[in-house]
A protein has these predicted regions:
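Residue-level signature of catalytic and energy-coupling elements of molecular machines
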Residues: 43, 54, 80, 88, ...
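C-terminal lobe/tail of nucleotide-utilizing enzymes
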Residues: 2-31, 198-283
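Glycine-rich phosphate-binding loops of nucleotide-dependent enzymes
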Residues: 117, 160, 173, 209, ...
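Phosphate-binding loop that captures ATP/GTP phosphates
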Residues: 75-77, 81-126, 131, 138
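Phosphate-binding/switch loop-helix module in NTP-utilizing enzymes
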Residues: 123-171
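Walker A/P-loop phosphate-binding motif and the immediately C-terminal alpha-helix
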Residues: 45-83, 198
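Phosphate-binding P-loop
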Residues: 38-44
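Conserved Switch II/interswitch segment of TRAFAC-class P-loop GTPases
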Residues: 151-158, 164-165, 176-197
Length: 283
């Protein structure tokens, strides 16, 4: 009995179009699960922002990276894939409903022109809960990619839900993710959780461009001394362990929190993520 999984020699008349071929040859490539953009949309690079657990500031980092790239003259966009806990519209002060036609939506724009799409822009009330099962949530994220008109986007940042469940898997498989940014906090336990996020990126063959440690320190307004409120940093050790080239630290700053609450994240100025943005530009 023959083994259907045994690779044969490449046929002489091979067209290299594996989608039309039933041969199990050595050159056969698995079918891609990536989904196309709708006609007329353009997204040059997709960067996923992930975390192993919630509450570490992933949406903040996503927003700040989008703002940084927009300031550098690129067209930035944010796809809010955190369907059950969306916070991107609040950070940017965007509250109007998304507009569109029968089978598509336009991305909303922030004050500085960043394109965003989030489930909160589609709900009758922003406080309505999204009580959906995993496959439905993952399907909604895919539709944000395929059914939204993205206008000449240079860098799209995907704000992922925490963990390694349905949505992260869907994003890695359905979108052409060029790189990952991992967000963490100083607690030592989080180092183990970060390992899971990094290992998932490795499993999906997507490079980790950098790690951002949020709430890394507090700077005393009187003496200027930095205090590690939540413990000493482990970010360099984690980065070295996984061979990740870039690290960044965000401070505990009431002004940043106030800007997010007021929908004015675009007014926050700081060079904390400059080196990471350089790496993203070079990707």
């Amino acid at each position: 009995m023959s083994d259907n999984h045994t690779h044969t020699e490449t046929p002489e008349n091979c067209t290299h179009d594996c989608s039309t071929c039933g041969e199990a040859c050595a050159q056969h490539e698995p079918e891609s699960l990536q989904q196309p953009l709708r006609p007329g949309s353009r997204v040059d690079k997709v960067i996923a922002v992930v975390s192993g657990k919630g509450g570490v500031g992933k949406s903040l980092v996503t927003s700040l990276l989008a703002c940084e790239m927009q300031r550098r003259g690129h067209q930035a966009a944010v796809l809010d894939a955190d369907i059950t806990g969306p916070s991107i519209p609040q950070a940017f002060g965007v509250h109007g409903g998304a507009m569109g036609g029968e089978d598509f939506l336009y991305a909303n724009r922030t004050r500085t022109g960043i394109e965003i799409m989030s489930i909160n822009l589609l709900l009758p009330n922003e406080t309505d809960p999204v009580v959906w099962r995993g496959p439905v949530i993952a399907g909604a994220v895919t539709q944000f990619w395929t059914d939204v008109q993205w206008e000449n986007v240079n860098y799209m940042f995907v704000d992922m839900p925490p963990g390694t469940g349905d949505v992260p898997l869907t994003v890695f498989q359905s979108l052409p993710v060029a790189g990952v940014v991992v967000v963490t906090s100083p607690q030592e336990l989080v180092g183990m959780i970060v390992d899971k996020a990094v290992n998932m990126a490795d499993l999906m063959h997507v490079p980790v461009l950098g790690i951002v440690e949020n709430m890394a320190y507090y700077t005393c307004p009187d003496c200027g001394k930095q205090h590690a409120i939540f413990g000493e940093s482990h970010i360099e050790a984690i980065a070295a362990k996984h061979g990740i080239p870039n690290t960044a630290k965000l401070p505990i700053d009431p002004a940043i929190a106030a800007a997010c609450d007021a929908g004015k994240i675009e007014d926050v100025q700081g060079a904390w993520l400059s080196s990471l943005a350089d790496a993203i530009e070079g990707k």
